[in-house]
């Protein structure tokens, strides 16, 4: 699927859905976009229902970056190597690191109240889906 269409369709499909750990959180939103692009469900096999559960999975992988690298099976790269729809690691003040979706200039992140657009300079790195 076209990457821009994948991001737009995922945004529209889940725009009104509430945040839910393990169902529609920052990582699950990025996984839904990645599945539209690649046809692979990267969230398969990861079950959690709370922030504590999610933190446990992240900690057992020695951090969010390591977890995503393991799940995707590719190393992280700099922003200059990313395409629209690629998952990104974003530093958000007060909240810490989160996973978002690259839209070409910004990151789209599903937060508890809504999806937000985060300026590109907050993107630490990402994973090119190929």
What is the predicted role of each segment?
Residues 1-59:
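N-terminal capping segments
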Residues 23-26, 31-33, 94, 100-102, ...:
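Generic alpha-helix signal with a bias toward terminal, lower-confidence helices
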Residues 36-38, 59, 105-107, 124-126:
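General N-terminal targeting signals
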């Amino acid at each position: 699927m076209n990457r821009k269409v994948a991001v737009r369709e995922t945004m529209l499909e889940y725009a009104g859905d509430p945040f839910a750990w393990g169902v529609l959180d920052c990582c699950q939103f990025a996984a839904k976009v990645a599945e539209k692009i690649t046809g692979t469900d990267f969230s398969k096999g990861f079950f959690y229902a709370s922030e504590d559960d999610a933190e446990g999975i992240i900690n057992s992988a020695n951090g969010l970056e390591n977890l995503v690298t393991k799940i995707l099976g590719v190393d992280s790269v700099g922003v200059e190597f990313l395409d629209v729809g690629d998952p990104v690691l974003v530093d958000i003040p007060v909240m810490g690191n989160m996973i978002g979706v690259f839209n070409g200039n910004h990151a789209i992140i599903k937060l508890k109240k809504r999806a937000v657009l985060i300026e590109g300079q907050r993107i630490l790195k990402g994973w090119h889906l190929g």
